[in-house]
Every structure is written in structure tokens, then in C-alpha cells.
Amino acid sequence: MAEQYADKQIKLFSLTANREIAEKISQASGIPLGKMSSRQFSDGEIMINIEETVRGDDIYIIQSTSFPVNDNLWELLIMIDACKRASANTVNIVVPYFGYSRQDRIAASREPITAKLVANMLVKAGVDRVLTLDLHAVQVQGFFDIPVDNLFTVPLFAEHYNQLGLSGEDVVVVSPKNSGIKRARSLAEYLDSPIAIIDYAQDDSEREEGYIIGEVEGKKAIIIDDILNTGKTFAEAAKILERGGATEIYAVASHGLFAGGAADILESAPIREIIVTDSVLSKERIPSNIKYLTASHLIADAIIRIHERKPLSPLFSYRSDKKD
């Protein structure tokens, strides 16, 4: 655990979505978690009570807006309001997983842009700054009229794979869809490895028609995506890579949601190991081949840098020498 942080005017509070990562962030930063309570009435209404003064303090509220996304979002909004009404100096939110970020555009007629709606609600509630981790769409930052710091997890993953010796020309980094090329290229640059892409002849409903752009035969493949939801994308990509001659298949994602029967799907896929961060505390069954890498040190460093008005740019080539 880090030494206690000297400045007493910064306070961390954890809401209920992911208490585990909040405790790790507290330990890594040396800032104790503040005292507060959150409960639901029988009709589902949320009630929050901050059990210590926050007057004049810089507040950081830690809350992933994962499942149940609406409960977690409303709990966050209510906590923001409570801090503002208690005369906090600034209210900053730490959202390791930002729910609704996939609804960032109008993909079909008469659809909403819900990511923008959520941004509006947070700003209206009184947020001064947002700190998040691997937004699904980086343009969501532009939906806010306040600073949004979007940390990247690729350096953490690269460190893990370099330690395993998974680097160089005998490894290929694979994007399981053409929209993820930039992410795959970023990891490939850290590993000095080539990239490949899995594309599809038609739309996503014809997954069995997938084909590989790039060379995977005789190589160890690492599939990378930002969100692991049902596991179907990873499982289908792994089968295509196996048919393409990949010798070993690994997978990595920033956020592990594990919705529905993801565990069964992933355990039956030819994937040796799946890496995710601890941004989401899933209540679903977790596949046996999952390994968690903590993002808590990265987030803790960012919080301290923001509070001390230091640049965050060193964190974008982040290397952690700390263990889970």
C-alpha cells in the first residue's frame, strides 16, 4: 500500500458497482475511501448519505456504469448532486467502464444518441471532470463540455504479453472486426508483431463467412477488442484463426461484461487465455481461462496527477512494476 497521501482536501468515494477496484485505487494512491452509504427503498429509489464533511474538498467518485447500468448511473448522478449540495470544491467522476458509450451515433433512422444524453446528464448534475478507461468510441469525449481523460490499457496488456515472451514476428495481433484495426495496431507496435483482421463477406449475421486479412498460419494469435460482452465475437474469431493455422490463440479486452452465457461460449472456444482489466465486477459466471489485470495503479496515478495539476501524457506509455 502506498504511503498516505499528504493533501487532506482530496477525497475518494466508492459507490456500489465495483467496490473492489475502488479499494485497490485507494491503496495505490494512499487516499482512504470516504464514508458514505447508499441504499435502495422497496420501490427502487436510491438514497445516498455522505457521512463526513466534503466542504471545500476535491471529490473523486468511483463508479463503473456496468450492469445494472441504469441503477449504477442513477446512483452516480445522485452522489454527484449530494456532493454539490454539500459544497464540495470540485466533483470528479472516475468511471472505469462507461456504459452507453456504444450508443455514440445514429446507426438507423430515429435512433437516439444516448452517449450524448448521458454526458448531458452528468454535466448538468455538476461534474467538473471525467476520468475513464478505454472508451468504446473516443469521440464520446467530445460530447462533454468539460475535461474528459480517457486512459488506455494497451500498454498494460503489452507488458503482460512481453513477460510471457509473446512478441516478435511469430506472434500476430488480430482485430476480430474491421472497426478495431487501430487498437490492434497499437498493441502490435508494442510487441513488434504484425497484425491481421477478420472481416466478413456480408453483415454480422453471417459470422461463419468470416475470412482473415493477413498471415496467421504457424503464428501465435492475440485477439484484441475493447468490450467482451457475450463472448461470441472472440469465440467465432478464434475458430476462424484455428482454421487458418494459428498455433496458439489468446484474447484480450479492456472490459469484461460476460453477459448471458459468455462463460460457456468462451470455455468451448479454442482460446488458451483471456485477459481483461478489473474495470467491471461481473456478477455472471466467469470463464475458467480468464485472467484479470488490475487497472487500479494506472487510475490512481491519473487521479494524483490531475489533483497536482501534472500532465497525464506519461501514462499513455504506462508501465507498472506493481502486482495485483
From Swiss-Prot:
CDD domains named in the record: PRTases_typeI (cd06223)
Disulfide bonds: none
Its EC number(s): 2.7.6.1
Cofactor note: Binds 1 Mg(2+) ion per subunit.
Binding site for Mg(2+): 136
Residues at which D-ribose 5-phosphate binds: 225, 229-233
Family matches, as InterPro entries: PRib_PP_synth_CS, Pribosyltran_N, PRibTrfase_dom, PRTase-like, Rib-P_diPkinase, Rib-P_diPkinase_bac
A GO cellular-component term linked to this record: cytoplasm
Pfam families linked: Pribosyl_synth, Pribosyltran_N
NCBIfam families, alphabetized: PRK01259.1 (NF002320), PRK02458.1 (NF002686), ribP_PPkin (TIGR01251)
Reported function: Involved in the biosynthesis of the central metabolite phospho-alpha-D-ribosyl-1-pyrophosphate (PRPP) via the transfer of pyrophosphoryl group from ATP to 1-hydroxyl of ribose-5-phosphate (Rib-5-P).
Identification of the protein by name: Putative ribose-phosphate pyrophosphokinase 2
Organism: Streptococcus agalactiae serotype V (strain ATCC BAA-611 / 2603 V/R)
